[in-house]
């Protein structure tokens, strides 16, 4: 009879374990009692011992789960309760499995929490931080929201860059108009002062006035003063490259010294024409050298892929400087040598380079005029500005021809008649200045994208440096708070 009881107990325990195969690998499977018999009495397991087959798992990853498992793992001490059928054992095992699954879910919740330092938010892998859903159920939504936020961030950055580019273009357009208005004002001052000075020279040569040279050159002083004031203009400094500014300052300084040397030469006759022309040679030579430097620097040293506007700016500024210096420097040298008698050549030979310059300038202006007639609305320069340049070059050619006839051919030409082409050219200069002031050209160096990107980079760097400390503090505080909430919930 005792043997039958023992065999029935063993069969009951084995059937209970085999009926739940999913519980074989779970910790709850260790709670199933194993019975042995000594002298016909079943032996009870000591659940407090570690060596017992039914030892309970009390901690998992530092989380106490002993309350849930120990509550349902207690067995009845009576023999009849211990002998319960397989259904009661299965119920106990299912309860243990449910408790362990709950503990595993809590562990997954704890492991699924991720702190996103860049956004200063506590996000879970399974979805929002309010639900704290673990596992892969909410993974798709989380990744979708992250990618959408990333796309929104990129779109916002593109919009900010476009807005910054529009601001820079508007600022460049405004500065461009101010620049050309200042240039127009300077041309008006130079033209009016030149007209007055030309009239004074004609009257002085014909003997109508007998003034001192220091008084006679007062209009020239006005021109130099306006040129000096233009060097301090912020608008001119921002839109014109440093090479043009340097050449302008050197030219103003050289012309000032040349005027002083001219007055000293004609009034006191202390030195010859060669010494008087030294400031002009210095000015024209510096223009020529800086033109070569700007052209070579833009071609060789400036990267056209990263900064194409900068490369174009150096090349465009270098070409007219090179052209002007190459025309004026040999003419100044030959004129100085002829006036001192060191070079026996006609004045027509000395003016060859000047004629070449006038012809090139006239052709360039004429072709611009032809192109502008077909597209008046989109043309860079207006028709009046181009016509003014053409008439100025024509008057310059006529004046040089009359001067050659008066000196080389020994023709008796009245001084006022000789100076008429100069007066007409100076009048067109005034007209061109007025036109530039009223209708500024559409010549804009479009570097708005580079300026916008540089401004955005500077703004981002400053904002990141300011908010770095606040980000660290807020992240640590949020991490501590969420950890405390999680531990209290568990």
UniProtKB/Swiss-Prot annotation:
Ranges of Acidic residues composition bias in the record: 463-472
Disordered as annotated region, ranges: 1-151, 455-490
Stretches with biased composition (Low complexity): 1-31, 66-80, 89-108
Record InterPro entries: TM_Fragile-X-F-assoc
UniProt feature, compositional bias: Gly residues: 133-145
Superkingdom field: Eukaryota
Comp. bias (Polar residues): 47-59, 109-125
Protein family according to the UniProt entry: Belongs to the TMEM185 family.
Name recorded for this polypeptide: Transmembrane protein 185-like
UniProt organism field: Dictyostelium discoideum
């Amino acid at each position: 009879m005792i043997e039958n009881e023992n065999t029935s107990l063993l069969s009951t325990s084995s059937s209970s374990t085999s009926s739940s195969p999913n519980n074989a690998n779970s910790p709850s499977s260790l709670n199933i009692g194993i019975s042995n018999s000594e002298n016909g009495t079943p032996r009870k397991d000591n659940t407090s011992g570690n060596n017992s087959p039914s030892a309970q798992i009390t901690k998992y990853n530092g989380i106490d789960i002993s309350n849930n498992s120990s509550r349902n793992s207690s067995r009845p001490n009576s023999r009849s309760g211990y002998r319960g059928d397989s259904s009661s054992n299965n119920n106990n095992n299912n309860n243990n499995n449910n408790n362990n699954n709950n503990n595993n879910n809590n562990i997954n919740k704890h492991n699924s929490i991720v702190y996103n330092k860049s956004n200063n938010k506590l996000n879970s892998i399974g979805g929002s931080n309010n639900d704290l859903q673990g596992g892969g159920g909410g993974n798709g939504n989380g990744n979708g929201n992250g990618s959408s936020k990333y796309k929104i961030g990129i779109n916002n950055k593109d919009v900010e860059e476009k807005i910054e580019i529009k601001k820079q273009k508007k600022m460049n357009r405004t500065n461009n108009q101010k620049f050309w208005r200042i240039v127009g004002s300077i041309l008006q001052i130079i033209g009016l002062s030149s007209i007055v000075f030309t009239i004074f020279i004609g009257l002085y040569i014909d003997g109508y006035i007998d003034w001192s040279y220091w008084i006679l050159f007062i209009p020239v002083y006005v021109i130099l003063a306006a040129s000096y004031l233009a060097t301090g203009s912020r608008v001119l400094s921002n839109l014109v490259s440093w090479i043009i500014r340097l050449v302008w300052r050197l030219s103003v300084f050289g012309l000032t010294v040349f005027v002083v040397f001219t007055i000293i030469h004609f009034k006191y006759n202390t030195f010859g024409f060669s010494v008087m022309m030294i400031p002009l040679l210095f000015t024209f030579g510096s223009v020529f050298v800086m033109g070569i430097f700007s052209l070579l620097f833009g071609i060789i040293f400036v990267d056209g892929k990263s900064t194409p506007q900068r490369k174009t700016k150096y090349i465009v500024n270098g070409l007219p400087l090179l052209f002007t210096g190459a025309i004026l420097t040999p003419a100044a040298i030959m004129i100085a040598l002829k006036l001192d008698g060191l070079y026996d050549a006609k004045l027509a030979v000395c003016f060859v380079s000047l004629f070449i310059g006038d012809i090139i300038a006239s052709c360039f202006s004429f072709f611009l005029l032809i192109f502008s007639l077909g597209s008046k609305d989109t043309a860079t320069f207006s028709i009046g500005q181009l016509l003014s340049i053409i008439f100025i070059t024509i008057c310059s050619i006529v004046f040089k021809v009359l001067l050659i006839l008066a000196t080389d051919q020994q023709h008796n030409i009245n001084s006022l008649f000789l100076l008429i082409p100069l007066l007409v050219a100076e009048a067109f200069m005034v007209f061109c200045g007025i036109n530039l002031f009223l209708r500024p050209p559409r010549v804009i160096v479009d570097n708005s994208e580079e300026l916008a990107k540089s401004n955005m980079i500077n703004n981002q760097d400053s904002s990141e440096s300011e908010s770095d400390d606040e980000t660290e503090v807020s992240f640590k505080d949020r991490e501590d708070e969420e950890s405390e909430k999680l531990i209290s919930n568990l």
